[in-house]
């Protein structure tokens, strides 16, 4: 199981809407037995920027959403404190997405490696090399 970051969803939607088979679609197709999830935070970010509301919600349907729980909040607070102490802050939404992945014990697939690699213990994957 893996969690897909908002950056991945945006690239996947662009490929899908253009009928292209790019890096994001190839990544999903490389192992059909792999399960993919998204954070409710990624759903929020994606839908906020999506033009046709109904279409955006339909686009996200194949990806079960992981909730922000008390456990996620605890992990996020530790991540935030650590990054602030290092002077290496990332956005609060990215912190919540990272905390969701850490709590679930799964890697995150993203195009935003620079931010997520700052989070200790988080396994970060890119789809661009596929």
Model segments located where?
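Active-site neighborhoods of divalent-metal-dependent phosphate/nucleic-acid chemistry enzymes
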Residues: 19, 65-111
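Nucleotide phosphate-binding site architecture
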Residues: 9-10, 44-47, 117, 125
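Acidic, PIN/NYN-like endoribonuclease modules and their adjacent C-terminal/linker elements
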Residues: 1, 98, 102-130
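A general structural signal for well-ordered alpha-helical segments in protein cores
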Residues: 39, 43, 53-56, 73-76, ...
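Alpha-helix capping/helix-boundary segments
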Residues: 8, 42, 72, 97, ...
């Amino acid at each position: 199981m893996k969690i897909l970051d908002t950056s991945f969803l945006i690239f996947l939607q662009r490929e899908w809407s253009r009928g292209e088979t790019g890096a994001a679609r190839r990544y999903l197709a490389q192992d059909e037995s792999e399960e993919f999830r998204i954070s409710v935070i990624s759903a929020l970010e994606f839908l906020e920027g999506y033009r046709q509301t109904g279409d955006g919600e339909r686009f996200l349907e194949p990806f079960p959403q992981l909730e922000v729980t008390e456990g996620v909040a605890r992990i996020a607070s530790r991540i935030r404190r650590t990054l602030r102490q290092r002077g290496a802050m990332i956005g609060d939404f990215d912190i919540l997405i990272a905390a969701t992945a850490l709590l679930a014990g799964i890697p995150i697939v993203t195009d935003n490696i620079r931010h997520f690699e700052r989070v200790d213990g988080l396994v970060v994957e890119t789809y661009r090399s596929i």
